[in-house]
């Protein structure tokens, strides 16, 4: 007779997203509009940071990815605010009996410069996740002229989350 496994005390999830960039701003990232010469092209608001965080949360609970939760061919997701995605992922994390220990993310963008916006983005993400700002790490890196990010043709983000059993 097989016994039911005990729920894991900790779970880790990894998320990634990228979008092509188009002319004219603003760029929506971390739930904020960042002024600049570019905007991300996508079916929703194309917020790469929130998409990566959503996938990290869903991955940590072995849930479906953002594309299965919010298909890009569904009309209701056209122009949709990515905060909705984070909200649904957080609801599922809570429903699974977990809470967020911390989130760490990196934004990959040549332009616009992210450094002036990092603290505001950390605060916005912490509020969305119902955590403290100390639980949200965020960095930004440029592409140094290499690949689509470095040529300002794309923007990307990676996120990792650690959950603990409540």
UniProtKB/Swiss-Prot annotation:
Gene3D superfamilies named among the record's database cross-references: 2-C-methyl-D-erythritol 2,4-cyclodiphosphate synthase
Cofactor note: Binds 1 divalent metal cation per subunit.
Catalytic reaction annotation: 4-CDP-2-C-methyl-D-erythritol 2-phosphate = 2-C-methyl-D-erythritol 2,4-cyclic diphosphate + CMP
Keywords: Isoprene biosynthesis, Lyase, Metal-binding
Cofactor(s) this protein cannot do without: a divalent metal cation
The protein's name in its UniProt record: 2-C-methyl-D-erythritol 2,4-cyclodiphosphate synthase
Pfam families with a match to the protein in the record: YgbB
Binding site for a divalent metal cation: 17, 19, 51
Top-level class of the enzyme under EC nomenclature: lyase
EC number(s) per entry: 4.6.1.12
Species annotation: Rhodopirellula baltica (strain DSM 10527 / NCIMB 13988 / SH1)
């Amino acid at each position: 007779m097989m016994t039911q496994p005990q729920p894991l005390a900790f779970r880790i999830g990894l998320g990634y997203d990228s979008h092509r960039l188009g002319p004219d701003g603003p760029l929506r990232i971390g739930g904020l509009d960042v002024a600049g010469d570019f905007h991300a092209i996508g079916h929703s608001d194309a917020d790469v940071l929130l998409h990566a965080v959503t996938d990290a949360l869903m991955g940590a609970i072995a849930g479906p990815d953002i594309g299965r939760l919010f298909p890009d061919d569904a009309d209701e997701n056209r122009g949709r605010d990515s905060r909705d995605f984070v909200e649904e992922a957080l609801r599922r994390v809570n429903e699974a009996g977990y809470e967020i220990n911390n989130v760490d993310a990196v934004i990959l963008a040549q332009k616009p410069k992210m450094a002036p916006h990092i603290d505001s983005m950390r605060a916005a993400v912490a509020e969305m996740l119902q955590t403290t700002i100390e639980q949200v790490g965020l960095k930004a890196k440029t592409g140094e002229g290499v690949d689509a990010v470095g040529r300002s043709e794309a923007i990307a983000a990676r996120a990792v989350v650690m959950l603990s059993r409540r």
